[in-house]
Amino acid sequence: MTKAVLGIIGGSGIYDLPGLQDVREEAIKSPWGEPSSPVRHGIIAELPIVFMPRHDKGHRLSPSDINYRANIDVLKRAGVTDLVSLSACGSFKEELPPGMFVLVDQFVDRTHKRESSFFGKGCVAHVSMAHPVSPRLRIHLAAAAEAEDIAIARAGTYVCMEGPQFSTYAESMTYKNLGYSVIGMTNMPEAKLAREAEICYATVAMVTDFDCWHPDHDAVTMQDIIRVLASNADKAKNLVARLARIFPREHEPCPIGSDRALETALITAPEARDPELLKKLDAVAGRILRG
């Protein structure tokens, strides 16, 4: 079996990972452009960890400016088998107040400015996104949250907006009435690209606010969010430390086939594939293309 390597993407407020030992920073080059930052390799409880702050140190990148393809490509090159995204979000439900964590199990993509696939002209692939989150990862995250006494919902739908502006009231009410759980700006196309790269993916959505639908709460501001971010970040770091202690050391085959997603996805005939695109796909799809 393959050794497990746990990747952690830190969202707003999470720019480092305390407890990471034997830290080594590496600036990995990607044919897809510049990633958000160098990755940090390290160990927690003898488990290999690769950490990347999504917005870079100092939060210099807005959600629309992040090079999601380069980030996922770099994490794949770093050997990541399982990826946890720690992401701030707004809530559409009373039962998901600020400070609550949500183990997202579905996504709705409302972004419109981002490159959302590694594949295209010269090498076409269609991966399934019916079940975008690894159920195995969610089980381990739920166990870690319970052990740390962190309030967490076991499921929820995350709608990803383009940003960087927050929702209008009409948008907020529309998403609430559609039954969505939380809203954020970063998990798409991140989840899609992780699937194309055959990396098992899960999101911990960390509620900071009620967006702007709630009649008893003011419209969301960055000041409100920052007040909650620090507490959420501390809990998230404890969650990761606990997850590392209980996470299997061998990569377990994904029950929904996330780590084999390309086996039935490629449609372009070998003789019609673009050699230049194939070079860029060496990490993401090398297992299939070389096979």
Could you tell me what each predicted segment is?
Residues 76-79, 176, 195:
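Non-catalytic positions within long, well-ordered alpha-helices that form the structural scaffold/packing
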Residues 185-223:
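Zn-dependent metallopeptidase/amidohydrolase metal-coordination segment
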Residues 261-291:
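Acidic, Ser/Thr-rich low-complexity intrinsically disordered segments
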Residues 81-82, 181, 200:
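Short acidic/polar active-site loop segments enriched in Thr and Asp
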Residues 136, 140-151, 238-246:
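Generic non-transmembrane alpha-helical segments
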Residues 1-130, 286-291:
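Metabolite-binding pocket within alpha/beta catalytic cores that recognizes anionic/polar moieties
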Residues 147-181, 267:
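Active-site/ligand-binding-proximal alpha/beta "capping" segment
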Residues 212-260:
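His/Asp/Glu-rich mid-to-C-terminal helical/loop segments that flank catalytic regions of hydrolases
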